[in-house]
């Protein structure tokens, strides 16, 4: 998917990018490739692949109608090189985006990236989701939490749901069907008062299958969750 294909496909979906937005995606690509030589950000560095498998894939929840251009508080867990939240922010500038990542070098990259792209209302924090999930400044504060290929739902639910307001939504982007994952996550979702409200499949323009699972938070998360860093992965609920 060339940049021109990317712009045209978005226009067909009703999103006509401004010259500023096009420049932001171009700068994003160039900085991603440049910084990838210093720290491991992605295995995908060819321009057409970045536009398809990072940029287009990241904004799929918007294209599929699951997010609006409103000043909602969005948290991205384990965003790595900023996916999916920063492409979403470029497309929908009204979003207020927070990223938590466990690697400080990635936070350095994201901070520089946001400055170069001229993004406002973006916040970056270094640390573990399990620790921030017990912090009152973060717990129960977000309308949406996004996670792209971070962990299976049994683990992901404990890392994300505590951050949501009641009625807030987890938007999980997956490359594989989530049916088996959701079956394994039933107990975790029950304990965390999360309910699957959508399990959506779609295709990238090249025909690759992708999946979006949306979980809504129904009640306050019990205070014992999330457990200490590492435990959700070692001993899933």
From Swiss-Prot:
Protein purpose: Specifically methylates the N7 position of a guanine in 16S rRNA.
EC number, UniProt record: 2.1.1.-
Keyword rRNA processing appears in the UniProt entry: yes
GO terms under cellular component: cytosol
Classification via NCBIfam families: rsmG_gidB
Recorded GO MF terms: rRNA (guanine-N7-)-methyltransferase activity
PANTHER family reported for this sequence: S-ADENOSYL-L-METHIONINE-DEPENDENT METHYLTRANSFERASES SUPERFAMILY PROTEIN
Protein localization: Cytoplasm
TM ranges: none
Pfam family of the protein (one): GidB
This protein's record includes keyword Cytoplasm: yes
Protein name: Ribosomal RNA small subunit methyltransferase G
């Amino acid at each position: 998917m060339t940049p021109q294909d990317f712009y045209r496909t978005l226009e067909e979906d009703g999103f006509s990018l401004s010259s500023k937005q096009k420049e932001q995606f171009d700068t994003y690509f160039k900085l991603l490739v440049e910084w990838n030589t210093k720290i491991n950000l992605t295995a995908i560095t060819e321009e057409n692949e970045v536009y398809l498998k990072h940029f287009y894939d990241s904004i799929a929840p918007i294209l599929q109608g699951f997010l609006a251009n409103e000043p909602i508080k969005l948290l991205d867990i384990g965003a790595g090189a900023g996916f999916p939240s920063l492409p979403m922010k470029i497309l929908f500038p009204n979003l207020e985006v927070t990223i938590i990542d466990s690697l400080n070098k990635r936070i350095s990259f994201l901070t520089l990236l946001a400055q170069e792209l001229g993004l406002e209302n973006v916040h970056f924090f270094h640390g573990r989701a399990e620790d921030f999930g017990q912090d009152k400044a973060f717990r129960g504060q977000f309308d949406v939490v996004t996670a792209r290929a971070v962990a299976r739902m049994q683990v992901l639910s404990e890392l994300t749901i505590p951050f949501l307001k009641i009625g807030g939504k987890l938007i999980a982007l997956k490359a594989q069907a989530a049916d088996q994952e959701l079956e394994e996550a039933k107990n975790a979702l029950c304990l965390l008062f999360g309910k699957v409200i959508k399990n959506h499949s779609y295709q990238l323009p090249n025909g690759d299958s992708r999946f979006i699972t949306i979980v809504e938070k129904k009640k306050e998360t019990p205070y014992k969750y999330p457990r200490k860093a590492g435990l959700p992965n070692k001993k899933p609920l």
